[in-house]
Amino acid sequence: MEYKLPMKVKPPVKKDGDIIFHIDVKLVNKADEIALGLQYICNRYLYGQGYRKLMGDFFDKMGLHSGTLIKPFIISSHVIPQMSFPGDIDFLIIPYENDQLILSKALVIELKIIRAKFIKQQKSPNEYGFSQAKGLIESGFPYVAVMHLIISDESPQSHWRDVLIAKVVDAKSGKIELIETIKKDMMPISLMERGFGRLVHNCPDERIGLLATYFAQEKAGNWLPCGKEAKFNDKCTVGILDKIAEYYYQNYTTFLDTRKYPPIKKD
């Protein structure tokens, strides 16, 4: 099933250095879900890696003039008036290509923040987000996923591991040159792998995409997420897709346009 509609209107493009969101510093300091969620979608590289995990071949085949329109933290009934559970949609993501909304590939994500500590790495989350994801499936959204965004403290340096640093010599051939060995805190990888394993083990519906992403704070860099592709929801209808489009048309200025490729610079 493929269903597209004209984009008609487009949010303003946010360039390097532009203000995207204003976030209350109190929410940032306490690592609130909204603050972390907004910071996550502003990290376009990390967001793109997660989107690729959840949408698989579709992402790989997206063309030069394509991208995603992201709306965070929406009251559910504003999109589907009769919808009551879950009460909100953490991320609504509508892909586009050549000024066409690809509504049949729209993705909604249920976000959970996982606050880990070195001394409690084995602790399971209180909630996985699957009940909310099931509600999103029952409401007819075409693709649904649960994302665990992981934050943590740092491991003691005595637990850091030896890793190799490599330099890319030839990007086309993939040739690299090993430079040196350094000590690195590899706990983020362990947390993602463990978290993803729990998601897979507890997931009640194969249609639900799964994503475990480490959100590095300060200068820890980006870590590639663990994920499983979402599958098309057979409860989706054209009526639901039209409601998603109508919501976009009425609120397009509040969506974040994240392109797959940087814009082509004109001479």
Question: Which residues are covered by each model-predicted region?
Answer:
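Charged, often low-complexity linker/regulatory segments
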Residues: 1-64, 229-267
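Phosphate/oxyanion-binding active-site loops and adjacent basic polyanion-contact surfaces
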Residues: 29-37, 84-88, 125
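Surface-exposed intrinsically disordered loops and tails
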Residues: 52-76, 175-185, 219-228
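Active-site metal-binding core of divalent-cation-utilizing nuclease and nuclease-like domains
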Residues: 56-107
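Active-site-adjacent loop/helix micro-motif of nuclease/hydrolase catalytic cores
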Residues: 116-129, 155-156
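Nucleic-acid nuclease catalytic cores
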Residues: 125, 134-218
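Charged, low-complexity C-terminal accessory regions
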Residues: 179-267
